[in-house]
Amino acid sequence: MQLKSLEISGFKSFADKTKIDFQAGMTGIVGPNGSGKSNIIEAIRWVLGEQAVKSLRGTKMTDVIFAGSANRKPLNMAKVTITFDNSDHFLPLDYAEVSITRKLFRNGDSDYLINNQSCRLKDITNLMIDTGLGKDSFSVISQGRVEAVFNAKPEERRSIIEDVAGVLKYKKDKFTTENKLAETTDYLDRVNDIIAELNQQKGPLEEQASLARDYQDQKQKFDYLDRSRLVKKLTIARDQLQGVNEKLASAKALVAKYQQQVDAGATKLANLKTQQTAQLKQKDELVAQNLELIKTIENTQGQQGVDAERRQNQQSEQERLTASLTATEQQIATQTEQQTQLEQTLSEQQAQVKAVKAQVAELTTATSAAGRQQLADELEKLRNAYIDEKQVQAELNNEAKNLVKQHQQSGSQSTALAERLAQAQANLKRVQTTVDVHNREQRDLENQVSQQQATLTAQQAQVKTNAERIDEQQQRWLDAAGLMQREKSRLEALQAVQERYTNFYAGVRMVLQHRQQFSGVAGAVSELLTVPDQYTKAVEVALGGQLQNIVCDTQQTAKTVVNFLKQNHAGRATFLPIERITARQLPVNTERDLSQQPGVLGVASELVDCESRLTAIKRYLLGTTAIVDTLDHAMAISRSRRFRCKLVTIDGETIAASGAITGGATRHDDNGLLQQQQSAEKIAANVAQMQSELVTYEQGLADLKKANQDLTVQVETTRQQLSELKDRLSQTQAQLQAAQSEQTQLSRQVKALTYEQQQTQADDSYEDLVARNQQAQAANAAKLKDYQDQMKTVQQQQTDYESYQQTQTTKLQAQREQLITLQEHVKQTQRQLEQCQATLAQNEETKKQIQADLTAIKTTLASQQMSVAERDTVLKTAKAKQAAVEEQRKTCEQQLATLNDQVEELSTQQVRLQQLAAAATDDYRRLELSQTKLTGEVDHATADLAEKYQLTVAAAQADVSGLALPAITEQLKLLKRGLDEIGTVNLGAIDEFERVKERFDFLNNQASDLTEAKEHLLQTMADLDTTVATRFKTAFDQVASEFSTIFEQMFGGGKAELILTDPEHLLTSGVDIMAQPPGKKFQRLSLLSGGERALTAITLLFAILAVRPVPFSILDEAEAALDDANVDRFSQYLNDFQTGTQFVIITHRKGTMMHADVLYGVTMEESGVSKMVSVSLADLKDEQK
């Protein structure tokens, strides 16, 4: 395949339609700077799919459209068409000629065509992928690309070999696979989160459903036997009721007779008991006074014994502390003396150290190298001066010889010599001006390059920092998004349970699901109470099933809803009509006393909130329940028997008013209605906060990306400006070098001509010149003699100084050893002093403490002495009072004994009458109770059949168990016990479990499919990595071999190698370059000179083209950094290489131009508009031959 032509219209400076036909061989494109040569290369890159605006030296894509000039208006479209000869079907299309067209309109629209057929940019990219002709391939080699090769890090340089290996397609496939893997993993994580949440629901629901089914089975059996029990009880009760009614009439008459006799005896007995009660009251008061006085006497005597024992203990402690104080004061005196001795010793040792340090410093100065260096420097100066005088001696000798020679020559060339000198001086002045101008330009450009390079480095560092921050922000966003998704899944599951009222009884659930039909229904208690987190469990336990009570406005509303449940056979529910419910509260005094008990947090009704209209409901439910922190405190309150209320702890234990204790734990304590509601609220709040954080992360991420994008544009602009500055600097340096070379030649010419003129004019003063020369030679000889004497003196001083220094060094070593010993003694003394000071301070503190304790004991003893006298007085007074009270009590007991005898006799008579009356009354009441009981049993059984089972007695008798009533009752007890053990069940859990299980199984299957897909993607990535590594290694070996061969050709010898920085990891290993140009050592590319690096980099690019030939290659001033000799080698290699590759070269170098077959010149005859002219150098070469 060959590049056949390029047609440009409206692209950058090519305003007019321009067509460039390319021939086989080497095509050169030349022209002055700014004429538009590089626009041709950019047009080729653009039409082949380049999308990076900065690579096209623009800020936006529409910058490639001709923007107008002084004489032309801007165009609205840029169009580039590139045509290939595809007769060898290099491109995978069935066309002998392939043309690719790209159009861009100023409104931003784009068109892409292949052989005039509309296509996508992706189609063009895919057509060129791995052909070596893509927008980023090595078919286009610029000076910047050459610099990138030798400036790149080894890890960046590996992309060159990857391009040769043709692994772009595989890496693109891997990138696509990685994206799919990330999506699959993300989706799998979300599915697993939902599965985990469903699994958490599934376990409790399965248990609830199982319990519900068991409950239904046992409930059916229970209802059947209960109906049979009611029918049998009703039949028996009717038969017994008839006999009881007859006995009841006889018993009533007998009760009236005995009651009259009892009433008369009761009046007399009441009078005696009144007297007895008064006497008993007086006795009790006297006994209480006597006991109180005895208690006072005993307490006072006991306290006297305790006080005596305390005084003895205090006196013993006082003696012990006094002895300890004396010992401590002795220790303080000893340690104070020791401290003084140590301070004196330390002062003496520090003085010795100071003296020895002064001696060491003095000897150190004496033995320093400064003196030796001063003598060496002086000797070196004398030698340099001696050598300078020797050079002067040689010059004087030459001058003398020249004087003789020039004196012998005479000439008539003075006039011609003067003209030549004037012309040379004029030329020198002109070149000097040019050199000054170029010097200034070079300094300015170097400063600009340095500043621009610093700016670029700073911008690149900021881009890297921003990229790291973007990665960190991206990771934080992903972590937050994943966490939020998991929380949302939990919230959705909880909301689904709440919306379906899954955890409510069937009847309650039916009412809540149809509440819109009943305007008076406020909701379930669990929905209407607001409970602080710390009390949730306590309130939930305290209310239990009452949380599912339904609050409504009136009894009529409750009746309407009850009828609704009956009609739909939807279960039962308990209703709390606001108009009828009365608040229940503890008495004010009881509530006040209860609040002061340890551990009491408050009455439950006052710790929760609700609407004001529901206050009575709240207090009805919780007004007599107190919340306590721990079970121990609750048990203590219950034992006091002062508070008749229900106690509930924070952990859910309860103590009833009767004293019954309930507690423990179940596996699903956190599934309560209130706890689920609070969990949903907390999760919703967390999700809202996470969403806010995500928005913040997204905004921060967008800001970072925008800032980095802007900064990247700035970096590219700076890099482009830097490249342009370097180009200008290279040109200026070349111009300066040429001017300096010319300046040097002209300076030499002026000096030579001036000297000739001076010699010609000096013939008249030949004798004077010879005399001066002889005088100068004599002075020179004297100076040489003087320098020789001074050098001998300095050398002797050096010898003496070495001997003196050796002696002083020995002394210095001895003094340093002594200093070290003294310093160690000082440290040891300081440690002893610090230890002594610490011990002394500790003893002082001990002394203060002992003194404080002694003072406290003395105060206590004085106080106790005063208390002894007071207690003696109290004891005497109490004993006297107790004797008087005891005498009064004995008198009262004698009077009470007489009354007791009278009461006893009359009571015996009254008891006998009462027994007779009571027996008659008991018979009557027993019969009456039997009547009431039997009537109640009949009514209750009839009502139960109607209310529970909606049956009449006749209908119930149609289906009765054949078991006897005791057997039925026993079985009912067993069934009731089973139902109680099951407890409250959620009948809706059966359907909910089936729904959750179905979704759980479905998602499990999905998770298995996703896991299998993930493993397949991982295997695909591993296969792609293997393919990339294999192709990379093969391409590397081939390029390395060609590189070594071509290096010898390009450098005319030497050797070079490509090496892998990490051969064990082919997927990440960098590529380093080692080179040894002729006459140099084997070293890294970065250590070579600039020209050697450039030529080595070009050699590597040629090696790449040799391994993977491309139909054509475009070189954009790739050889700009080479000298003339290397440019010739470069051009010659292109001639040898072009048999298989077509080359298009943009160049300024004459050596390159000479080897081109066709030259295109780019000019700007009209400002801002590029034109093309061409000439066939091959034809010219043939004509010249």
Curated annotation (Swiss-Prot):
SMC hinge domain ranges (all copies): 519-637
Molecular-function annotations in GO: ATP binding; ATP hydrolysis activity; DNA binding
UniProt entry keywords in alphabetical sequence: ATP-binding, Coiled coil, Cytoplasm, DNA-binding, Nucleotide-binding
Primary location class: cytoplasm
Residues in coiled coil: 228-503, 675-928, 989-1025
Binding residues for ATP: 32-39
One Gene Ontology biological process: sister chromatid cohesion
A Gene Ontology term for the protein's cellular component: cytoplasm
Localisation per UniProt entry: Cytoplasm
Extent of Basic and acidic residues compositional bias: 307-320
Region listing for Disordered, in residue ranges: 300-323
Family of the protein in this entry: Belongs to the SMC family.
Role played: Required for chromosome condensation and partitioning.
Complex and partners: Homodimer.
This protein's domain notes: Contains large globular domains required for ATP hydrolysis at each terminus and a third globular domain forming a flexible SMC hinge near the middle of the molecule. These domains are separated by coiled-coil structures.
Name this protein carries in UniProt: Chromosome partition protein Smc
Organism: Lactiplantibacillus plantarum (strain ATCC BAA-793 / NCIMB 8826 / WCFS1)
Gene designation: smc
